[in-house]
Amino acid sequence: MRILYCASEANPFCGSGGLADVAGSLPHTLCRKGQDCRIVVPLYGTIPQELRNSLNFITNFTVPVAWRHQYCGLFWARWHDCTYYFIDNEYYFCLLY
């Protein structure tokens, strides 16, 4: 089965609560059971630099939003046998809290 797991946060890349714990562990369990599970999360500014260094650039494009066009970058990384995709947009995701 092919599964695309989308979440606002996933450990170890970004997380502040229970959702990050589930999104960081459930897909890995599915991968270990032979499923093709991939995870999509925002590329937050709070992701540690050592993890950011493991990201691979795929492409970038613009997305029409009302009267303007917003940049969107797409990156990927492998972590514990799962593929993560990261959506980059500093306007929305550069949260340095």
Task: Give the location of each predicted region.
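Short loop/turn segments at strand-loop or loop-helix junctions that form parts
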Residues: 87-92
